Regions:
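Basic, low-complexity intrinsically disordered segments
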Residues: 1-132
Length: 132
């Protein structure tokens, strides 16, 4: 009987830890996606006023001031992410940026929504989503 109590306490601790990790990750994902959406929106608006070359200029400056990770292709992906959301794709916070990158090449909104739903329903890791 005593053995069972220890087990339950250990199990509860581990379950609570798993829940915390997921909440923490979802919070992190939500923030990251929100930031990338906002950056994409600003890039889209800046592009209308200053032309496509603005992404190259911003990329150069951001890389100098903040560091790597803000290359031209990444900034273009952020803009593409914003444009997809604006077309009506609802992106749940469970998806990581890697998941988003896997669906960005898809042009059909229904296909995008399909892959988002199977990603969540089947809890697909990024690599498995990319294979589909």
């Amino acid at each position: 009987m005593l053995n069972c109590n220890y087990y339950n306490e250990i199990k509860n601790e581990l379950i609570n830890n798993e829940i915390y990790k997921r909440v923490k990750d979802y919070s992190k994902n939500r923030n990251e996606l929100s930031v990338y959406y906002n950056v994409g929106k600003l890039l889209s608006e800046a592009g209308k006023h200053y032309g496509e070359g603005i992404i190259k200029e911003y990329s150069r400056k951001l890389t100098i001031e903040i560091g790597s990770g803000y290359g031209i292709s990444n900034l273009k992906r952020m803009r593409q992410f914003y444009l997809i959301v604006e077309k009506g794709v609802a992106l749940p916070h469970q998806l990581s940026w890697s998941h988003i990158l896997a669906i960005l090449p898809i042009n059909n909104i229904n296909e995008i929504n399909y892959y988002i739903s199977i990603s969540i329903e089947q809890n697909l890791p990024y690599r498995q989503l990319r294979e589909k």
